[in-house]
Amino acid sequence: MLRLLVLFCFIEMGVTTMTAQGRTRRPMTEFTTDTAMVHDPVMAYEDGVYYMFSTGMGIQLMTSSDRRSWTFKPGGVMGRDGIPAWTHDSVPGFRNHVWAPDIFRFNNRWWIAYSCSTFGRNTSAIGLISSPTLATPQWTDEGCVITSRQDRNN
């Protein structure tokens, strides 16, 4: 009986592994939901539209006219492919997971500050992007604001 149980466990592990490896990543598409399940959200309002930015592979974006029904925008503000090269130079091991965005308006522009880091290390950076309007898909990379140093703990 024990041999049969062990055999079953190995077969199950093999099936699970094959299934996980055989999966293909589906491209993200625009969709609408009444539950905005996001991390570290920050919201801004412009011209009758609420814009919610959040942690993700790049800066995620959802929009709403009523704050009840949210539309996910694929690629967000700064999608996985739009992350500036300086982030990888400043943060060794950075894997495009941008977190804790914050937004503010100054001098007739919108500004988003965001964090880049490598899990388990003390090297991080804060970047800044800007745009004259929230509705644009094009944001300007304003570069790095500050970085931490690996050899310092404070």
What are the functions of these language-model segments?
Residues 5-14:
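Bacterial N-terminal signal peptides
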